[in-house]
Amino acid sequence: MELVLGPLEARVIGCLIEKEICTPDQYPLSLNALVNACNQKSNREPVLELSELDIRAVVDELIRKRLVVNTAGFNARVPRYQHRFCNTEFGELKFTAQELGIICELLLRGPQTPGELRSRTNRLCSFDDVTQVDAVLAKLAEQGPYVVKLPREPGKRESRYAHLFSGEVDLQALAEAAPASSYASPAADRLTALEEEVESLKAQLQLLAERLAQLEG
């Protein structure tokens, strides 16, 4: 697979995919909305604090790679960004909803077990059980390959999977940065839902402000 994304490029692409699925009425994203999505404290590993300048530089590089496009008109005051990572008319990468849900989570949170992926993708797609997640992961590992099964960590019941859109996985660096927690608690799930609702409201306000500016202009 020729495509290689840097860590911040993976974060931006993951955020654009996530918002396209979860909040389609606010997609494509403005730069401000994209910054908020990249810095979101829920469903992100690691949590980052990126500036508009940081994100603009990443977006410019992704536009150069033809993985992101500005859908706003040439004279528009506010650019709006849409990914062209997959499922485009002439693109090579075509994924089902389940495949895309898994890839999106891996881009946003790094290596995860099938159980974690089933729990965390419920806002992106649906799986009947972990066996179905295993089957989709096996398919993604055969094609491309797009994901890889990592060696099982000591004391863990399940192996984690990582995406390969950023090249081969550095196992030593991964082991040193391995997260201590596994499944999210119900309280964490509620917090995630609230944070996503806040981000959605922020995006709606931003969209209203842009439309008001256009009417006044």
From Swiss-Prot:
InterPro entries: DUF480, WH-like_DNA-bd_sf, WH_DNA-bd_sf. Transmembrane segments: none annotated. Disulfide bonds: none annotated. Pfam families: DUF480. It comes from the Bacteria. Belongs to the UPF0502 family. This is UPF0502 protein AHA_2872. It comes from Aeromonas hydrophila subsp. hydrophila (strain ATCC 7966 / DSM 30187 / BCRC 13018 / CCUG 14551 / JCM 1027 / KCTC 2358 / NCIMB 9240 / NCTC 8049).
